[in-house]
Amino acid sequence: MAVTDVFARRATLRRSLRLLADFRYEQRDPARFYRTLAADTAAMIGDLWLATHSEPPVGRTLLDVGGGPGYFATAFSDAGVGYIGVEPDPDEMHAAGPAFTGRPGMFVRASGMALPLADDSVDICLSSNVAEHVPRPWQLGTEMLRVTKPGGLVVLSYTVWLGPFGGHEMGLSHYLGGARAAARYVRKHGHPAKNNYGSSLFAVSAAEGLRWAAGTGAALAVFPRYHPRWAWWLTSVPVLREFLVSNLVLVLTP
């Protein structure tokens, strides 16, 4: 069975439209948005593990690199997965406020580019929408492979710069260029964007991710995270994938 066979059944147009509808809440109601995304992500990880191990990931340990305040912790705990969140920014760790103070799991303040874990420590290593926020995304990916046990899963998902959501809260102005979009945001709002080009947001292409994954010798699959199964072919078309694959998932095993 291919690693994506189980998840492919879930990757329907209805799911894509539901997730797209919830994106409008990312800035104004992040708890609502991330609960939906967390449930979908936990289901995706469960499907990928089931396809490769013929059993659900119950009792396994997952490391969430760049987990922020732990929005994903409850979803994975509910699935029976042990959760460890890593986040370098103390403000992000507490961004969810009191509603998430009792969240399950373990939380560590550290950089994803220098994970404070021993080699072969976890069963699953996940990074969801983080690679575009660090200056060396493939160093992050290499660290994820290092801490994952042989036969485990590494799932690195990131927003493609030239896709429609590449500019984050800067909107489609990123097509004018990152620096110009950042300056335009400051003029309009009077302060830099949270996801500020050049400091907390970087231009990461689909081609870069595919090249890195292939170079590791550990790649199992690549697919567009939010697209229905019938649109996954887009990842195989150079140039087109940069604009139409909004979020790329790289699945690897050490």
Curated annotation (Swiss-Prot):
It comes from the Bacteria. It is an enzyme of class 2 (transferase). Induction: Induced in response to the thiol oxidant diamide. GO terms for molecular function: S-adenosylmethionine-dependent methyltransferase activity. GO terms for biological process: methylation. Keywords: Methyltransferase, Transferase. CDD domains: AdoMet_MTases. Signal peptide: none annotated. SUPFAM superfamilies: S-adenosyl-L-methionine-dependent methyltransferases. Its EC number is 2.1.1.-. Belongs to the methyltransferase superfamily. This is Uncharacterized methyltransferase Mb0229c. It comes from Mycobacterium bovis (strain ATCC BAA-935 / AF2122/97).
